[in-house]
């Protein structure tokens, strides 16, 4: 395995995050912070605690996972689609790099970027709502697993997309119903008695 190639692809993608810091890190953090302010603090202050858990604390995991899903897919799909669109992917394909090494580089960078955004959102949430994490190691494991899984899914979307419309419509058709169905089958929609 060519670790130099993996490292080169990984750091090239991480450098792209540095160049587009506002849209890749600050934008999702600010939009999620607005949810924490509106739903967690303002509306959550009017809802009584249920079994010692405030409404603001209750919505933090859902908002965190929703951001991780969308960021993992968009980071990975755009990361492979844009070089394909501009033609610079041929330089990577001409190099002595296996397909597995390309996947590890792109998906690893996408998962890292998404995890960074997730950790920043988690830290930001503590400013707006009272947050207590019961199992931090399990939570971190699930965050990493979610980032890797949906980064692989986004990489596949980026490979199969022919234009920018396909790049955006597939997550809209698949991820949005997935998130809505997870909300529907989860505990908030079931009676508690």
Tell what function each PLM region has:
Residues 1-137, 141-186, 190:
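Hydrophobic transmembrane alpha-helices and immediately adjacent juxtamembrane helices
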């Amino acid at each position: 395995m060519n670790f130099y190639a993996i490292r080169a692809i990984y750091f090239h993608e991480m450098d792209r995050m540095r160049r587009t810091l506002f849209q890749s890190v600050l934008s999702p953090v600010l939009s999620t912070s607005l949810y924490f302010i509106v739903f967690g603090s303002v509306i959550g202050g009017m809802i009584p605690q249920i079994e010692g858990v405030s409404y603001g604390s209750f919505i933090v995991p859902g908002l965190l996972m929703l951001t991780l899903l969308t960021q993992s897919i968009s980071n990975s799909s755009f990361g492979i689609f844009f070089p394909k669109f501009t033609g610079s992917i041929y330089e990577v394909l001409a190099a002595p790099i296996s397909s597995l090494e390309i996947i590890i580089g792109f998906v690893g960078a996408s998962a890292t970027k998404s995890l960074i955004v997730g950790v920043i959102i988690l830290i930001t949430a503590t400013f707006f709502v009272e947050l207590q994490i019961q199992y931090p190691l399990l939570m971190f494991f699930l965050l990493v697993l979610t980032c890797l899984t949906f980064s692989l899914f986004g990489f596949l979307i980026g490979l199969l997309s022919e234009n920018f419309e396909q790049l955006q419509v597939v997550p809209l058709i698949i991820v949005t119903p997935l998130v809505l169905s997870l909300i529907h089958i989860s505990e908030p929609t079931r009676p508690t008695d």
